């Protein structure tokens, strides 16, 4: 590849950026905003992928193989769907796609947030019981909706960066990626 490919001279850096000039980007509120977006979509994606196996085992009594298979099915499509997210962001704009992703995540995560609950209320006529919570199928469907939204959102955040920081795309992408990675762990 190295011998048979060429480089475009316009892609080469013409000025030497200093470390201090790159670190000045940390003072830009937009960079910090993109860090927050990416910590939700990437950090949340990684966090969910790491958490879901144990949750399936402890909450739904799945065996480890079933839970790991669901976690793998959640994690693997993220790359393909990220490419789709790039196309959607190019077509509809990073702003609309990112906010759509955030609203889908908010609604789905709200529904996922309520734990399995068994309530008993003592009444005059005896105890009344209620069970509240999601069974494994709706839980998994909602989790996959969140995963798809987060995969699309990972691309839309970088579309923001390429639109607004074309001359500093490397530094801003590095900062945003660092924050997103830290958020997942």
Predicted feature residues:
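Juxtamembrane helix-start elements in MFS-like secondary transporters
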Residues: 63-71, 135, 139, 172-173
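Extracytoplasmic gate region of multi-pass secondary transporters
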Residues: 12, 28-79
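Intracellular helix-loop hinge segments at the cytoplasmic ends of transmembrane helices
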Residues: 54, 155-164, 177
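Helix-to-loop junctions at the C-terminal end of transmembrane segments
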Residues: 81-93
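A late C-terminal transmembrane helix in Major Facilitator Superfamily
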Residues: 167-185
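Recurrent gating helices in multi-pass secondary carriers
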Residues: 2-10, 38, 42-50, 151, ...
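Small/hydrophobic positions within alpha-helical transmembrane segments
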Residues: 4, 40, 73, 77, ...
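C-terminal transmembrane helical hairpin of 12-TM major facilitator-type secondary transporters
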Residues: 95-156
């Amino acid at each position: 590849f190295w011998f048979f490919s060429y480089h475009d001279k316009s892609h080469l850096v013409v000025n030497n950026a200093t470390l201090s000039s790159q670190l000045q980007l940390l003072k830009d509120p937009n960079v910090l905003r993109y860090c927050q977006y990416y910590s939700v979509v990437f950090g949340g994606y990684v966090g969910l992928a790491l958490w879901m196996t144990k949750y399936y085992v402890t909450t739904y009594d799945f065996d480890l193989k079933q839970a790991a298979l669901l976690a793998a099915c959640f994690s693997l499509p993220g790359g393909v769907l990220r490419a789709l997210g790039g196309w959607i962001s190019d077509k509809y704009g990073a702003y609309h796609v990112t906010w759509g992703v955030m609203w889908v995540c908010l609604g789905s995560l709200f529904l996922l947030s309520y734990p399995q609950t068994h309530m008993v209320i003592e009444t005059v006529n005896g105890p009344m019981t209620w069970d509240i919570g999601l069974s494994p199928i709706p839980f998994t469907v909602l989790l996959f909706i969140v995963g798809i939204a987060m995969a699309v959102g990972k691309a839309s955040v970088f579309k923001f960066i390429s639109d607004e920081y074309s001359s500093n795309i490397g530094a801003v992408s590095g900062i945003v990626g660092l924050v997103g990675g830290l958020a997942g762990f």
